[in-house]
Amino acid sequence: MNYLVVIDTNVLISALLSKHSDSATVQVLNAVFDGTIIPVFNDEILAEYDNVLHRPKFKFPDANIQSLLDTMKTYGVFAKQLITNEILPEPKDLVFYEVVMAKQDENAYLVTGNSKHFPKKPFIVTPNELLDIMK
């Protein structure tokens, strides 16, 4: 089974920085590469991924960043934002929420390490919760 998932940037960063191959964030990222997770995004989300992944403090090689972004674009799904009246504690997170809302008719999830930044909804999950759903 495949799962449509909007992936918050913090999940990608955590996966790439993790030294544990069995961590939940690494397993989520691996599921993107094996096709179990179909990433959902728009241009703003891709730009955020690119911007954050290129921050000097992370020292991720350009080739690795490009490979990840290319995989997301090739195997993922582009979605327009569904404009909502939601007020979030972190306004920059609104795009992730609105993109997942646009795909609710297809049972999409938003996976984040910062669930407190989003409304409590059953489709907004932590990496561990997503892995449980995928079992």
Residue ranges of model-derived segments:
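Acidic, metal-associated active-site segment
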Residues: 90-109
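Metal-dependent nucleic-acid phosphoesterase active-site entry motif
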Residues: 1-20
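Acidic, metal-coordinating catalytic cores used for nucleic-acid/nucleotide bond scission
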Residues: 86-92, 115-116
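Membrane interface segments of multi-pass transport proteins and intramembrane proteases
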Residues: 58-59
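Short, active-site-adjacent cap segments at secondary-structure transitions
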Residues: 12-13, 47, 117-119
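Acidic catalytic patch
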Residues: 43-46, 64-88
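Acidic, PIN/NYN-like endoribonuclease modules and their adjacent C-terminal/linker elements
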Residues: 105-135
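PIN/NYN-family metal-dependent endoribonuclease catalytic core
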Residues: 6-7, 24-54
